[in-house]
Amino acid sequence: MKRYFAILAFALCCVGILKGQTATDSLTIVFAKWEVTHSQKGIVCKSVSLPMLYNCPQVINMIEIDPSKGMKARVGISEGMKRTSFIAAEHHALAAINGSYFNMKQGNSVCFLKRDGLVIDTTTIGEFNLRVTGAIYERKGKLKLIPWSREIEKKYKRKRGTVLASGPLLLENGKACDWSRCEENFVQTKHPRSAVCTTK
């Protein structure tokens, strides 16, 4: 079976996806009429506007990336505060999302970031308490989603590739993750959200 990396850029709050999703919400997602907004070898961009999902209108944008077509995923790093679109252009990316959390005044990551053995930033206690329960590990253009915690971060020794902590981790091995470590207000508050997933 083909392996796809799907990047979901939500102009919605994906709070209800794992908790509190109704049967109506499930059916709305299953029967959504996706519009293909762009397609080229290895990349398909889709969008759907839903009048009612999780008790309000939602717009969902999804990018499916097929690594078997030569597409690679990378964690882009840039100095200072720049828009995601500028960082994408610097790295010649075809698509990009803001992958983690950062200090809005200083521009540095507030989540663990390590590239090829060099620790660039560590996760703040506040972020661990609020939402950081996962990370993206990238090496040679391949992504792996992994659980993350303060204990894992303290012992993390891998020298090759890039790891970027973020969260919350939504699924692990096809099962919903425990969100009890996440601050409830973050989970319940509706904001635009982004998510990354891999499929087999």
Positions of the model-derived regions?
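Generic structural signal for short, solvent-exposed loop/turn connectors between secondary structure elements
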Residues: 4, 14-18, 76-85, 89-92, ...
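Zymogen propeptides
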Residues: 21-135, 142-145
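Aspartyl protease catalytic domain
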Residues: 90, 107-200
